[in-house]
Amino acid sequence: MSLLLVASLVFKAVAILLLGRIAWTDFSTQRISNRDVLLLLCLGLGTLQFQSLQAHSWLEMGISAFGGLALFLALFPFWLLQKIGAGDVKLMSATPFLIGGSNLAMFSIFLLAFALATLAVVKNPFLLPAGMFRHYVQHMDRKGIVPFGVPISAAAICAVALQMYHAIVVATSSGILEQLN
């Protein structure tokens, strides 16, 4: 394994931990701090930098920048209408830098699945085991609060974990196809 790949995997592992923290903070306080989003953006840019150096192409970084800008411009009006929080807009805008432009479709599928699961839990809190979580979700339903950072973070964690798995499998493969050629 190359040093760039190892550094990229370390950055992605730290990003997964940070996404877990963002999800928990958003669930418990309905706040996503600027510091966490900025750190996530820096980790994503670092990972993209390593991948660009390894592939000798900056296309992935350009696609990610375009995706981040497009998501920000698409979600900003919803923030102005107070339909979504500013932290959710910032998190969605930083996510393409972490995921990479070529994996945004996979992230979108994960996001759809987790958003539907969140909707089901918020609308029917009896799906949860008894205790604090059920009480808290019932409170969120009464107030009309939905922590969108939780499904965004969960989808990003799944997408990044799948990328890490794929990178490790490719890096540790025996190269049998190359030997056949």
Question: Could you describe each region identified by the protein language model?
Answer:
Residues 1-84, 89-181:
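A membrane-topology feature that recognizes alpha-helical transmembrane segments
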